[in-house]
């Protein structure tokens, strides 16, 4: 058995790194109700997402149903497997079944036709916990992201990977030097699975391992935009900047906006002016590219913006978080609000049997006032999540508190296990005191009661001709009229 599988973590406590993500998963599982959002785990491959989900299921004693990229994930398959599993109880005695949809951002081609829509329907109707796993958060449809609770898994630092490698070497009785462990941990680039596989490949047939025997392999990965922006403002050579720009999977106009978002960190006025002139010149090249369809100009645009801003920053580095361009953030917020509004209007229209246009134009102000007066009832009847309730209340903290109280009430209503109920039913019979013995009364002393005289029944009243007898068993306000 390969070591990556042999030493896969069995419990959440065994997961290396990502402490906040693991804690978020545990809290979600302990407080899960039918109203809870599915979890969406995202992050680069090999950092423990799938292992964490299986460890969670083992800790909670939940059965598991998994669909991954190796399966056909058409609408029919998802409905038959995950859809049925999400609404039915477990046959093994487990309290719940955990539905795992791995590589949810990789629904492509005819083999996965209709899969994204089927996942949405499965989430809407689910009565069992669901976890989606993705490498790229934005590879999922926006509506799917909004219906899930995101949990980010980050790449592991080498100092977190090294102790796990030492533990494996100790378990396999292999003497491994510090240099070998350090080299493997650094080469893995945050990927625990890759580190364990490299250790396994290096240790085959050996009783000891040092730096000379280590077989490392660099994974063929694209450079992230964050690495490129950091390099632009750091002490990076021109050749290295051009190489990094070729390995980034972004268009030049997108790179330009990312770099522009961090230009404000340049404090020297002269340097700031040079940076903006470089970006302006690069923008002209990008415009020429689209107007003339001459894409060779892209290379000039990239070189001008990167080398110009790097020269302006003078290698002083960037000392703040690298954030997406502000325009993108505003567009993302607007898109999210639009999706929430559309979902709320759709539910209201279906409940009230009115067209969405009529609701939006005539009744939204009144409904908003009613929701503010009794948010619990509306949240329960319309199955609103935090975003949907906040759409009416415009108070996110209040919306979350209301949903927490509703979830607590639902958990209290859940039936207890049958064994406890049976014990409670049997306990009164065991604890009850026996009835006191009563001396029987002799038959001679028992008083004899005479049967009451039967009175002849009154003759029925004669019915009027042409009139039927009506029963006066009124069950509603309008009976008898």
Swiss-Prot record:
<comment type="similarity">
    <text>Belongs to the activator 1 small subunits family. RfcL subfamily.</text>
</comment>
<dbReference type="InterPro" id="IPR047854">
    <property type="entry name" value="RFC_lid"/>
</dbReference>
<protein>
    <recommendedName>
        <fullName>Replication factor C large subunit</fullName>
    </recommendedName>
</protein>
<dbReference type="InterPro" id="IPR023935">
    <property type="entry name" value="Rep_factor-C_lsu"/>
</dbReference>
<dbReference type="Pfam" id="PF00004">
    <property type="entry name" value="AAA"/>
</dbReference>
<dbReference type="GO" id="GO:0006260">
    <property type="term" value="P:DNA replication"/>
</dbReference>
<feature type="compositionally biased region" description="Basic and acidic residues">
    <location>
        <begin position="408"/>
        <end position="433"/>
    </location>
</feature>
<keyword id="KW-0547">Nucleotide-binding</keyword>
<dbReference type="InterPro" id="IPR003593">
    <property type="entry name" value="AAA+_ATPase"/>
</dbReference>
<comment type="subunit">
    <text>Heteromultimer composed of small subunits (RfcS) and large subunits (RfcL).</text>
</comment>
<feature type="binding site">
    <location>
        <begin position="43"/>
        <end position="50"/>
    </location>
    <ligand>
        <name>ATP</name>
    </ligand>
</feature>
<keyword id="KW-0235">DNA replication</keyword>
<feature type="compositionally biased region" description="Basic and acidic residues">
    <location>
        <begin position="441"/>
        <end position="457"/>
    </location>
</feature>
<dbReference type="GO" id="GO:0003689">
    <property type="term" value="F:DNA clamp loader activity"/>
</dbReference>
<dbReference type="InterPro" id="IPR027417">
    <property type="entry name" value="P-loop_NTPase"/>
</dbReference>
<dbReference type="GO" id="GO:0005524">
    <property type="term" value="F:ATP binding"/>
</dbReference>
<dbReference type="InterPro" id="IPR003959">
    <property type="entry name" value="ATPase_AAA_core"/>
</dbReference>
<feature type="compositionally biased region" description="Polar residues">
    <location>
        <begin position="471"/>
        <end position="481"/>
    </location>
</feature>
<comment type="function">
    <text>Part of the RFC clamp loader complex which loads the PCNA sliding clamp onto DNA.</text>
</comment>
<feature type="region of interest" description="Disordered">
    <location>
        <begin position="408"/>
        <end position="481"/>
    </location>
</feature>
<dbReference type="GO" id="GO:0016887">
    <property type="term" value="F:ATP hydrolysis activity"/>
</dbReference>
<keyword id="KW-0067">ATP-binding</keyword>
<dbReference type="Pfam" id="PF21960">
    <property type="entry name" value="RCF1-5-like_lid"/>
</dbReference>
